[in-house]
Structures are given as C-alpha cells and as structure tokens.
Amino acid sequence: MKTKLGFNRLSRKSSHRRALLKNMVISFFKHEKISSTKTKLFEVKRFAERLITRAKVDTVHNRRELSKFIHDKHILNKLFTKISPVFRQRSGGYTRMIKLGKRYGDAAEMAILELVEKPLKVE
C-alpha cells in the first residue's frame, strides 16, 4: 500500500481525477475565479501555479507542453497573452484561496480560488 503520496486522491480513480482537475483548471483560467470544496481547490491551485509559471516564457515548446493539459486554443492563448504577462515579476503565489465556510448539505469546507492580480485587457 502506497502511503504519503504527493497529492490528494480525491476519492477518485486516476483518470477521473485527471479529468476533474483538467476541467477545473480550464474553468479557472476561463472565468479567473472558481468556487468548490477546499481540497479540490488545493489540487487545482497546484496545477494552475505550475501552468502560469510555464506560460511566463512564451516559446513554442512551452505552448506545446501546456497544450497537452489545456486543449482549448482560446484559453491557452489567454493564458499566454493576458494572464502570464501580469505575473512576470512575481516568482510564485499567483492565486489566492478565500474560505467560505461549510456547505449546508454535507458540511464540506467551501472556498473560492482567484487570481491575485487581474489579467490584462487586450483588445
């Protein structure tokens, strides 16, 4: 039995967990803010921070590496042109988690994940 993994399994199989995280990260970059349970958002935060760090250097290699995880061209372009330029001087801590309290139905800890700074308005 493997113990002390470097991530939370979220009570899902690996393919389901990967699909969940991929969809949540894409929604996060699309809306710049998402609300969910605290444990899910901790995992989303880890992925989002890694992707933003990778997107700070706009090369063909980095675009191809991120396109493995983000399949939507518009979201990928938004990440490279609007979100990552804001964080060029920052070496980490691109997101903020605001705790909301417990959910009524099952008392799960809820939170909001958002970007620390607002993305650029490129028109």
Swiss-Prot record:
Q: Is Translocase among the key words of this record? A: no
GO MF annotation, one? structural constituent of ribosome
Q: Which keywords accompany this UniProt record?
A: Ribonucleoprotein, Ribosomal protein
The record ties this protein, via InterPro entries, to: Ribosomal_bL17, Ribosomal_bL17_CS, Ribosomal_bL17_sf
- Signal sequence extent: none
Biological process terms in GO annotation = translation
Q: Which domain of life is it from?
A: Bacteria
Q: Is Ribonucleoprotein among the key words of this record?
A: yes
Q: Name one GO cellular component term.
A: cytosol
Q: Which Pfam families match?
A: Ribosomal_L17
Task: State the family it belongs to.
Answer: Belongs to the bacterial ribosomal protein bL17 family.
Q: How does it assemble?
A: Part of the 50S ribosomal subunit. Contacts protein L32.
Q: What is this protein called?
A: Large ribosomal subunit protein bL17
Name the source organism.
Borreliella burgdorferi (strain ATCC 35210 / DSM 4680 / CIP 102532 / B31)
